[in-house]
Every structure is written in structure tokens, then in C-alpha cells.
A protein has these predicted regions:
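Helix-to-loop junction immediately C-terminal to a conserved catalytic motif
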Residues: 62
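Conserved ABC transporter NBD signature motif
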Residues: 70-81, 85-86
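Conserved ABC ATPase "signature" region
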Residues: 110, 114, 121-139
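Conserved ABC ATPase signature
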Residues: 143-147
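Catalytic Walker B motif of ABC-type/P-loop ATPase nucleotide-binding domains
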Residues: 168-171
Length: 252
């Protein structure tokens, strides 16, 4: 279960003005009063344009970024109180794959698994299953530097799931992936949903949301504009597409 209450995150930005002691900066809220709850086994999709606060929200929940105020509780553990324990229960894929170019796909997964002290017999079996599900078997000995953006995304997903986490957070997992690859990735997300994992994923692809997400949050300029079930989202405009509803929410 995930419980987020009144999360705020502020940063300082350059105003372009000069003061007595140099550049004048102003604070702004990248995330402004985010609250929601997610039960075990549910899937939440966070939607919104670039810069709306999706990534900042996910990083705070995953314990990668300290909130300015507010709380995030994952599986009854306060993230701010015990980041290490929370991180051991979470698989977090950033929207920047952050892979080592000189390593092959196999070496990348082995390195991450050993770093997290996952027994060989466990991570090998898990990796084989994920490679097969993501249609990656022809690329396992290729260096990261030689992979397409889509294949790098898939490698990052395997790295995220290799320790079989209870909670999975995916930040725009299909970015830069072709249509076939998007379908393969979302099939995997649906598969891990069936295993009872709790999942949060952000996306620009509204078509990915309808058949997988149990709940939807729409963000703009750091604020939550909609929070409800997929059915409630569609019920706002029963005869309109997901895209049309999204446009109405974010332009209101």
C-alpha cells in the first residue's frame, strides 16, 4: 500500500534579474500538495505534460528526493524515516536510463543483481523470464552504447524488476520506444499487475492507461487536477476519448 499526504517540493529558479549580491532567484513548487492512496495490487497512472511534476513526485515516493514537506508511506514504512528499507521494496525506473555504455545487456543485469546481493540462481531465472517477455534475447551480448533507445528502456526495465520488488515505479517506460515495443512493455506491466504488484507509472501515451490503470492522476504545473478511478475519468465525458478528456482537464 502507498499513502501520500500533502507532498510539496520547491526549487529555486533564476529570475533573470540581478540583485545587490548577484542573480535573483525565486522559489517555485514543482509539486504542490500531492495526496493520494493506492492499495496493494493496484495500478496508478500519472498523466501530465513535461515539467508538470510527475518525475519529482515519483522520486519522492521512491526515496530518491527529499520532500520540502509532507509524507509518503510505502508498505507501512515512512520514506523519510527509513529510505534504505523502502528502496529495498521498490523497483524504480527513472526516465533517464542511466546505464553504463561499456557493458553488455547481460553484464548490466549481472552487475546490478550482484550489487544488490541477489543470489545467482534467482536473478538468472528472473532475467531469462524478463528477457523473453520483452523480446530481448537477440540483444543480450550487445553493448549498451550500441542499443536503440527502445532497447535501452527495456534493459532498464529488466534492471528495475530483477529483484522482484513489491512496488514498481516506472517513469515514462515507453518513451522513445516504437509501437510494437510499447505494446510489449505494457503487456509486461499487465503481467506484473496480475502477480499482485503495486505499480505507479507515468506516461504521455494515454492509450496505455485505459486497459491497465485502476486509478489515474492528472497533473499540471505541480498540482493535481484529477484523482480517481479509470471509470470515473471516463465518466467525466462518456462520449469523449481519453485524449479529449485529458485536454479538457489540463486546459480548465
Amino acid at each position: 500500500m502507498i499513502e501520500v499526504r500533502n507532498l510539496y517540493k520547491s526549487f529555486k529558479a533564476d529570475t533573470g534579474k540581478k540583485g545587490l549580491f548577484g542573480a535573483v532567484k525565486e522559489s517555485f513548487f514543482a509539486v504542490n500538495d500531492m495526496s493520494f492512496s493506492l492499495d496493494k495490487g493496484q495500478v496508478l497512472s500519472i498523466l501530465g505534460p513535461n515539467g508538470c511534476g510527475k518525475t519529482t513526485t515519483l522520486r519522492m515516493i521512491a526515496g530518491m528526493l527529499e520532500p520540502s514537506s509532507g509524507t509518503a508511506v510505502v508498505n507501512n514504512i515512512d520514506v523519510r524515516a527509513d529510505k534504505h528499507k523502502v528502496k529495498s521494496n521498490i523497483g524504480y525506473m527513472t526516465n533517464n536510463t542511466s546505464l553504463y555504455d561499456r557493458l553488455t545487456v547481460i553484464e548490466t543485469i549481472k552487475f546490478f543483481a550482484e550489487l544488490n546481493q541477489i543470489p545467482v540462481e534467482i536473478y538468472k531465472k528472473r532475467a531469462e523470464e524478463l528477457f523473453s517477455q520483452l523480446d530481448m534475447n537477440d540483444y543480450l551480448n550487445k553493448k549498451i552504447a550500441d542499443l536503440s533507445t527502445g532497447m535501452k528502456q527495456k534493459t532498464s526495465i529488466v534492471r528495475t524488476l530483477i529483484h522482484d520488488p513489491d512496488v514498481v515505479i516506472l517513469d515514462e517506460p515507453t518513451t522513445g520506444v516504437d509501437i510494437t515495443g510499447q505494446s510489449i512493455i505494457m503487456d509486461l506491466v499487465n503481467s506484473i499487475k496480475q502477480q499482485g504488484k503495486t505499480i505507479i507509472f507515468s506516461t504521455h501515451q494515454l492509450g496505455e492507461v485505459k486497459d491497465i490503470a485502476d486509478k489515474i492522476i492528472v497533473m499540471a504545473k505541480g498540482k493535481k487536477l484529477f484523482d480517481g478511478t479509470t471509470s470515473e475519468y471516463q465518466a467525466k465525458k462518456p462520449n469523449h476519448s481519453f485524449n479529449e478528456i485529458f485536454t479538457e482537464i489540463t486546459s480548465g
